[in-house]
Amino acid sequence: MHGHGGYDSDFSDDERCGESSKRKKRTVEDDLLLQKPFQKEKHGKVAHKQVAAELLDREEARNRRFHLIAMDAYQRHTKFVNDYILYYGGKKEDFKRLGENDKTDLDVIRENHRFLWNEEDEMDMTWEKRLAKKYYDKLFKEYCIADLSKYKENKFGFRWRVEKEVISGKGQFFCGNKYCDKKEGLKSWEVNFGYIEHGEKRNALVKLRLCQECSIKLNFHHRRKEIKSKKRKDKTKKDCEESSHKKSRLSSAEEASKKKDKGHSSSKKSEDSLLRNSDEEESASESELWKGPLPETDEKSQEEEFDEYFQDLFL
């Protein structure tokens, strides 16, 4: 080799070899010092075929797992079916299931629904019965919706109201007939509803709000019981009493006019006696007030006040 200035040296190669060997020793020592106990050895050579195959299989399994996780249940099922047919043979028709016996939630509720649930019905609850009971609990069971299409045959259909009907006022502020939406002249009726459910005959008292035409349909064969509020009954009683008092006053006035013709002396005496009697009654009532404590008045509870308020609201 040529050195600087064109001079050759016989010791230049030996010096370079010594420096490279020292560097290798230093790197090996540094690697040993920096090596961690769980660290694997570095392969300076080409890996064995078996090791390379294991690494490839592991990487492919990881990718496949991520791919399956990204799928939903249906896509995963179709992939497995296609892989099975691809590797083991067969037809896709063998994997098709018959949908004749499939049931939706609505079918399950129709099969297990009950108009009224008793304690006996809630025994031995299956998932179908639990679903029907959950639907029943969400219904509003104050007023019913009626189907009066077969009223001439004395056949009626009743069901409870759902949330939308309660919000819209159907069955309470509008006619409770399924095919009628009138809101004038509504009357409340109480009907003894007899029905057969799951092979068992049952009865239930049902309240309905119907217009005049639908009330005629309901009472086509025999009249049902009409529900009236307490205040209306009290008003009718008061009206009857007032009319009877008016009649008695008129009759007394007529008799008094007849007696006036007979003589004024007797009328004066009667007036004096009436005035004396009224004065005596007033004095007696005043004396009775101071004899003892005031009579106790029955105070209504909060529940009774709420009941009266809701009766005026609903009827």
UniProtKB/Swiss-Prot annotation:
Modified residues (N-acetylmethionine): M1
Described purpose of this protein according to its UniProt entry: May be involved in pre-mRNA splicing.
GO BP of this protein: mRNA splicing, via spliceosome
Residue stretches of biased makeup (Basic and acidic residues): 236-245, 268-278
Principal localisation: nucleus
Originating species: Homo sapiens (Human)
Protein name: Protein FRA10AC1
Domain of life according to the entry: Eukaryota
Keyword Metal-binding recorded: no
Acidic residues bias spans: 301-315
Intracellular or extracellular location(s): Nucleus
Annotated tissue distribution: Ubiquitously expressed with higher expression in brain, heart, skeletal muscle, kidney and liver.
Self-association state and partner proteins as the record states: Interacts with ESS2.
Residue stretches of biased makeup (Basic residues): 226-235
Modification N6-acetyllysine, positions: K36
Keywords, alphabetical: Acetylation, Disease variant, Intellectual disability, Nucleus, Phosphoprotein
UniProt cross-references to InterPro entries, sorted A to Z: Folate-sensitive_fs_Fra10Ac1 (IPR019129), Histidine_acid_phosphatase (IPR050645)
